[in-house]
Design a protein with these regions (language model features):
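Structured beta-strand-rich core segments of catalytic domains in phosphoester-bond hydrolases
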Residues: 35-38, 42-117
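Short, flexible loop segments at the rims of nucleotide/cofactor-binding pockets, characterized by
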Residues: 6-11, 82-85, 123-126
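Active-site-proximal beta-strand elements of phosphoester/diester hydrolases
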Residues: 1-10, 102-115, 149
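Long, well-ordered alpha-helical scaffolding segments within enzyme catalytic domains
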Residues: 124-136
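Active-site beta-strand/loop signature of hydrolases that rely on acidic residues for catalysis
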Residues: 6-7, 22-40, 105, 135-155
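N-terminal, active-site-proximal structural segment of metallo-dependent hydrolase catalytic domains
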Residues: 1-49, 62-65
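Short histidine-centered catalytic/ligand-binding loop motif
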Residues: 116-124
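Amphipathic coiled-coil/heptad-repeat helices and related helical stalk/stem segments
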Residues: 14-15, 89, 132
């Protein structure tokens, strides 16, 4: 099984690029970040034609994450959850419980905290990471399988 992650920076304008990439590599699961569209505007049919089911947490014009899974791998008890780590509604984290491998997958699009000289922006980023850590630690403590992928905006 291959899992891939891609900050696609506006999914609707990169469909042909995605198709070429996908047909060459054939990952089972794709984590997309910065899809830059509302969930209702996501090109679900395009991905279905490639055999991929789309799980979307979109936001108009910015942010947004999606998880694409080969339809043949899905189970009725798979579960998707939108996760919000701040008081503001920001589509940055989506959680997928994948029954077939008894694993939770998080797709993350972390906030940018640059420049560091903007202490408030950087401070908000660190607080966001603390909340992400609090979300993930129970999996580790309870020895549950978890995959965390995405764009972490490290710089």
């Amino acid at each position: 099984m291959i899992l891939a992650s891609w900050n696609i920076n506006s999914v609707r304008i990169r469909l042909e690029i995605f198709k070429n990439w996908y047909e060459k590599r054939k990952p089972s699961i794709v984590l997309l970040q910065e899809i830059k569209c509302e969930s209702s505007e996501f090109p679900v049919d395009f991905f279905l034609e490639l055999g991929l089911k789309s799980y979307i947490y979109g936001q108009k014009g910015r942010n947004g994450v999606a998880i694409l899974v080969k339809e043949s791998l899905l189970d009725e008890s798979d579960k998707i959850t939108e996760v919000n780590l701040t008081d503001k509604l920001e589509a940055r984290v989506i959680k997928f419980f994948f029954k077939r491998i008894n694993t939770t997958i998080y797709n993350v699009y972390a906030p940018n905290g640059n420049p560091i000289s903007d202490s408030q922006k950087f401070s908000n980023k660190i607080k966001w990471y603390e909340k992400l850590k609090d979300l993930i630690l129970p999996y580790i403590y309870n020895e549950k399988k978890v995959i965390i992928g995405g764009d972490f905006n490290v710089l």
